[in-house]
Design a protein with these regions (language model features):
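Hydrophobic structural segments
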Residues: 1-131
Length: 132
């Protein structure tokens, strides 16, 4: 069984963090890299209800498209809803990895999947920022 680091390595090979817009904060938010990953739950948003479902199903990792945080956070005491989400995930041994604008921009990412679905032929980037 792969551990969290191995799963993250695959995710970040497919969806490199360097593809993220400057304002975005994708990647591993919560998790112990040495923990084994048996079950993964996917969702659009890391809402409290989604966290409940991930915990109830025994997920070791929750992968969401939208981030839990858009700005720097200086505490996760559990007093706010984001802190509560981090606390609950940590207590139940469930990691959280976010693939947002990096997943949008990656080859075979969200943008490419949408283009394929709609049968688009001439495809280009909407961002002026050059990718490294």
């Amino acid at each position: 069984m792969p551990n969290l680091k191995q799963v993250i390595d695959v995710l970040e090979t497919l969806y490199p963090l360097r593809y993220a817009e400057e304002w975005d904060e994708p990647g591993l938010i919560v998790g112990d890299l040495s923990h084994d990953v048996h079950r993964i739950v996917f969702a659009a948003d890391p809402t409290s209800a989604i966290i409940d479902k991930a915990i109830a199903t025994g997920a070791d990792l929750l992968i969401t498209h939208h981030p839990l945080f858009f700005r720097s956070v200086h505490e996760t005491s559990g007093l706010g809803f984001r802190g509560d989400i981090v606390r609950r995930l940590y207590q139940h041994g469930c990691g959280l990895w976010v693939g947002h604008t990096n997943a949008d921009a990656a080859y075979r990412g969200v943008g490419q999947a949408a283009a394929d679905y709609f049968g688009l032929i001439e495809i280009g980037r909407a961002s002026c920022r050059e990718r490294v």
